[in-house]
């Protein structure tokens, strides 16, 4: 019985001694609100003016892949991917996401297509 009490006493003393650790917790940095990013705002504006929502949503597959899947696939790629993907938006095509062809958007400027791509890439999972 004395051994059990002694064991509890030692365990209590050891747990009370916290060492030199700070008692304040460091909070993890908060994830930035992407809706405040100018690239997000411009992308939403351009998406509304074009036919993107006919085939895409942020999270659900329609005719085309969800924007979040696109963002996750290209996360970590160099910035040069923006111009490449924008040219794919303008020219259309198939093969990357299956055999259903994305319609060309030849009336879209390279700058606007790049703005839409930047918006999409912001939607990646954190």
Predicted regions located by residue number:
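Sec-exported extracytoplasmic/periplasmic mature domains
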Residues: 48, 72-75, 79, 90-94, ...
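Gly/Gly-Pro-rich "capping" loops immediately C-terminal to redox-active cysteine motifs
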Residues: 57-88
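The canonical Cys-X-X-Cys-His
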Residues: 49-59, 116, 120
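Electrostatic cytochrome c docking/interface patches
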Residues: 24-47
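Positively charged n-region of N-terminal signal peptides that target proteins for export
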Residues: 1-4
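Bacterial signal peptide processing site
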Residues: 17-21
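Axial heme c-ligation environment in periplasmic c-type cytochrome domains
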Residues: 65-71, 90-117
């Amino acid at each position: 019985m004395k051994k059990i009490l002694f064991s509890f006493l030692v365990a209590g003393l050891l747990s009370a001694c916290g060492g030199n650790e700070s008692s304040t917790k460091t909070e993890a940095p908060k994830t930035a609100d992407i809706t405040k990013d100018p690239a997000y705002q411009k992308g939403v504006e351009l998406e509304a003016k074009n036919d993107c929502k006919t085939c895409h949503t942020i999270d659900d597959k329609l005719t085309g892949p969800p924007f979040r899947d696109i963002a996750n696939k290209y996360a970590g790629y160099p910035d040069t991917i923006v111009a490449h993907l924008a040219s794919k938006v303008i020219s259309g095509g198939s093969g990357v996401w299956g055999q259903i062809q994305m319609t060309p958007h030849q009336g879209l400027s390279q700058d606007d297509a790049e703005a839409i791509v930047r918006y999409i890439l912001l939607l990646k999972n954190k």
